[in-house]
Curated annotation (Swiss-Prot):
Main location: virion
Lineage, top ranks: Viruses, Duplodnaviria, Heunggongvirae, Uroviricota, Caudoviricetes
Keyword check for Cytoplasm: no
Function: Distal (knob) tail protein that plugs the end of the tube before DNA ejection and forms a channel perforating the host membrane during ejection.
GO CC, alphabetical: virus tail, tube
Record note on quaternary structure: Homohexamer; forms a hexameric tube structure with six flexible hydrophobic loops.
Transmembrane parts of this sequence: none
Annotated protein name in UniProt: Tail knob protein gp9
Gene: 9
A Pfam family it matches: Caud_tail_N
Amino acid sequence: MAYVPLSGSDVRIFSDVPFSNDYKNTRWFTSADAQYSYFNAKPRVHVINECNFVGLKEGTPHIKVNKRIDDLYNACYMIFRNTQYSNKWFYCFVTRLEYVNSGVTNLYFEIDVIQTWMFDFKFQPSYIVREHQTMWDANKEPLTNTIDEGLNYGSEYDIVAVEQYRPYGDLMFMVCISKSKMHATAGETFKAGEIAANINGAPQPLSYYVHPFYEDGSSPKVTIGSNEVQVAKPTDFLKNMFTQEHAVKNIVSLYVTDYIGLNIHYDESAKTMSLKDSMFEHTQISDDKHPNVNTIYLKEIKEYEEKTIDTGYKFASFANNEQSKLLMYPYCVTTITDFKGNQIDIKNEYVNGSNLKIQVRGSLGVSNKVTYGVKDYNADSTLSGSQKLTASLQHSLINNNPNDVAIINDYLSAYLQGNKNSLENQKDSILFNGVMGMLGNGIGAAASAATGSAVGVASSATGMVSSAGNAVLQIQGMQAKQADIANTPPQLVKMGGNTAYDYGNGYRGVYVIKKQIKEEYRNILSDFFKKYGYKTNLVKMPNLRTRKSYNYVQTKDCNITGNLNNEDLQKIRTIFDSGITLWHADPVGDYTLNNEVI
């Protein structure tokens, strides 16, 4: 029980004081004069000049008031002065009224230790459990506060925004990889089967052809160095790849990708792209039977480049809320996905800077591989640029879906190509043997005629016909074999995977999906944070007056010192450990008041 003096003077009993001895709320003042003026302006129920307090020994301090109990029904607060404390004002709660007789009432009270000693105790750095904090910085950006509140926020999210981002808009790249070159370099004679080793991130022996195209089947205008190139349609490119003799069975991989590992200059409105002539060259794949196919050949790439896509303000699209913490995880989350089984969740507050930027990396490998990472995510400011780039890989979406285009193995073309020389040799041999057989039989017939042997002449003539007939039959048999092969259905040696589904349905690049908790829970949590602030869990000086209307403060084993008795000091510590709202404006308890940071 708080210490009570033996007597008091200038006792004033008030009504309409809006807080009680549960110490959930109190009025917090900047000066003793402001404090006195506040209470002295309250409606007076009764005034006593001098009185002695009774019941102190029993722990039930009270005064006798010469007034009917009905006249004191609304008495809730009392102040008095004591000459032993330099005329200090003591502030008290009226706790109970007791009927004595028709003209006398016992008024029980207890000392309001907060108001009585408000300017006599001081906080030292203490462990702050929760309090009202600064929510926004000078640029109106939410300050990071992700301490778990332990509150229910529901089990489902509302999707508030879905945006698709592709490295080059509608532009895609078909990458064709062959065992050997399928074209002749300008000024040189084409050599089938020529291995063209080069640098593609690393030394390698394969030949790479890059064919840009759009969803509608058209192709962009391409500039390589200073030369303009109009590449063929993707369908024409594919058609020729599987009909030209030196291309059949030469292709080892064929896939579609959004990014080839180079931050090329691309103008989406003009549908033009520019490539460096040190890396690429314009080529024509052709033979003597089919039209030329304009495409792009990879000469050399020593190092790949990343491309940065700025998706805009990281907190855009989320519901406006005066509570900045509701923009933090888990109340808001951004998901980056390609809808192909690759997905990462991003906590927006850990993205350095105001905008969410995605870094795209890729390559011209034997299959598709593109990564999408969040720039400067969880990256300390002490890291260098290259270190930040590497660190972002830890939070990347890796799309290594094959995106293959089906490769057709035309058995007839392959047979003709692989056996071209032997087939010609067989034909020549058959014809030569047939002719020689005819000549031999012809000489035999002439000899028989010279000797007058009619049987010999007839036999040799029959041999001539037989030799010629056998040659024709052998050639016909060889052609029949080719016809049988031609009737064999073309086989898929490499399936197209889900490329048609993914690209046909527009699943390209990545999607940035913003999600937040349901409105019901947003409202519940907003009201809670508005009333009780945020968890702090820091040793610091408490925020006793940082808001316009009220501050909530809760401590643990708080460190308070002051020039007052130890019993009251301990009670003050207990009050702050239990949590109390310090009101700076009236009406006390009105949470609709403007409570902006001051």
